[in-house]
A protein has these predicted regions:
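Acidic, metal-coordinating catalytic segment for phosphate/diphosphate chemistry
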Residues: 1-32
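Acidic pyrophosphate-coordinating catalytic loop
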Residues: 97-109
Length: 186
């Protein structure tokens, strides 16, 4: 049986031998997880404090880089467990976030996930590269999202796809945008 050839006369094997990855740069892939803690009417959001650069000491969503041997869902589960101690199978995709300048380390595309848990049953334990992991009270009023853990208050307005911080403290990366998108889906 003859091998199928493309318009350049190459078989698939020949094409793959000549294929140049550098002609098509690949982004780094990450998963970020918005963990909403519910207990009755009370809502909380689980954040980690970054232990390293970039954005050292800033609050962020749990998440991290994907390995070539895992799916994005597996990355989300692994990173959530490694950084916070939360082991939850209940995650659902929020969306893909791919602005070219969203991460100072380079072209990083993240698949964001939503995870809903009962926060009274999930103790936050910092691990891996997270310096700290804490539940923040979550309030949403007039398109203003406020996160408060008693020591730090992060407040921002989300309107027409844009984030405007009200507080001095901010979240790392584009995590305010990801949180706002998750809240829209609740």
């Amino acid at each position: 049986m003859d091998k199928i050839r493309d318009k350049n006369g190459l078989t698939e094997e020949e094409f793959l031998e000549k294929y140049k990855e550098k002609n098509y740069p690949s982004p780094y892939l990450t998963a970020d997880i918005v963990v909403i803690g519910l207990n009755g009417e009370q809502k909380k959001l689980l954040l980690i404090q970054r232990g390293g650069h970039p954005f050292i000491n800033m609050w962020a969503l749990p998440g991290g880089f994907s390995r070539q041997t895992e799916t994005m869902e597996e990355t989300a589960h692994r990173e959530l467990l490694e950084e916070t101690g939360v082991n939850s199978e209940c995650i659902s995709p929020i969306g893909l976030f791919s602005k070219p300048d969203r991460d100072p380390r380079g072209w990083v595309v993240t698949q964001a996930y939503l995870c809903k848990v009962n926060f009274t049953e999930c103790k936050a334990l910092a691990g891996d590269d997270a310096k700290n992991a804490e539940w923040f009270d979550l309030t949403v009023k007039n398109q203003i999202i406020t996160l408060d853990n008693g020591d730090c208050v992060i407040s921002f307005k989300y309107e027409s796809g844009k984030i405007e911080y009200i507080s001095k403290d901010k979240l790392a990366f584009d995590h305010a945008e990801i949180i706002a998108k998750a809240i829209e889906l609740l």
